[in-house]
Amino acid sequence: MTSITKWIEEYRITEVECLMPDITGNARGKVMPASKFEREEMKLPEGILIQAVHGEWSDDYWELVDPTDRDMIMRPDPDTLCLVPWWDQEPAAQVIHDAYTPEGELHPLAVRSVLRRVLKRYEELGLRPVVAPEVEFYLVAKESNPDFELKPPIGRSGRPETARQSYSIDAVNEFDPVFELMYDYCEAQGIDVDALIHESGAAQMEINFLHGDALRAADQVFMFKRIMREAAMRHDIYATFMAKPMKNEPGSALHFHQSLLSVETGENVFSDEDGEETELFHHYIAGLQKYSPALMPFFAPNVNSYRRIAPEISAPTSLHWGYDNRTVGLRVPLSGPEARRIENRFPGADANPYLAIAATLTAGLLGMEEKLKTTDAYVGNAYDEP
């Protein structure tokens, strides 16, 4: 806590948001006075780990956690400490916590623990996953009645979008004040934004993140969703990460580009010395092909998630892989050997980034361990298949 305490004193922090991503990807925790945060260990009841998005608990509650609903010990990760830029009154900080059992072990059900276990497996093999997320979302008008359909908000022109505006700069600029504030918030929290894109839907946007450490990538998606919602609400609109918020508009995805580096050499193990594809590259893809069906609850965790998965709207409906082909579930973008990677297009924007990354890395790992073989790369429109 020494480095955290010094940082809190340097920035004259008065309040600390002590966060833990739950199983749904939402933030749970406590807001504590800085003085209390520095001197007291935070605890949370174990049952919080399995609270559903609607506030209820699993029918298997007593089989998953201790029946006494005992406390977990929450320990802050110093690497996630940052300012909360939307606190207007006094300087505030936020920090993501890891959950530990009373016996001192990382809690097995905490989503950061799940991802850490997968990354440990890779570390034992001398490999380091590199992940670059792409998250899509909609800006929508505020609506107090939950039974009414969501609608695009009014932009600077005084009217809502009514047509498809893929990659339109002017359509993005309709909400320029929102995104300027978003960029300010991202800078304050150290979020590595690579690009902002207008997607196919009305007021649908996409944010690309720089590639990097897998746990850091999950943290950034988790933090960004809070940032985007806060920036939107400051302008009296809302940002939704539902997979399919509007019936007649495309769904929102959370794509993950992934590659593997050798810890020893730092080189991409998906490419050999001649720049050609390696066997590991194909084993990894084959693992995703074999295990993705079983992992769909991590990629599509809600009923609404499956409304997104339909032909002709850039959502995958097959396990095919292909080169620069957006109709397949596993796309290999055009790149040089050093950037050879696989894009998993199955997850929706509503997926928990920690669990979705853990799932996709696990599938690839099993493919390599079992030396699975891929199908041939798909050529053409995969939606043409029945």
Task: Please name every model-derived segment.
Residues 166, 171-175, 179-193, 207-214, ...:
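Accessory "access/gating" subregions that flank catalytic or transport cores
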Residues 148-157, 254-262, 319-321, 328-334:
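Short beta-strand elements
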Residues 230-231, 237-238, 263-386:
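Catalytic-core signal marking the mid-to-C-terminal active-site face
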Residues 95-101, 205-211, 258, 344:
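Short, hydrophobic beta-strand segments
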Residues 135, 199-207:
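Short, conserved phosphate-binding/catalytic loop or strand-edge motifs used
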Residues 203-205, 250-256:
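A short, glycine/Asx- and small/polar-enriched loop/turn
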Residues 1-193, 217, 355:
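ATP/Mg2+-dependent ligation/transfer catalytic cores
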Residues 243-248:
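Short, solvent-exposed loop/turn elements at beta->coil junctions and helix N-caps
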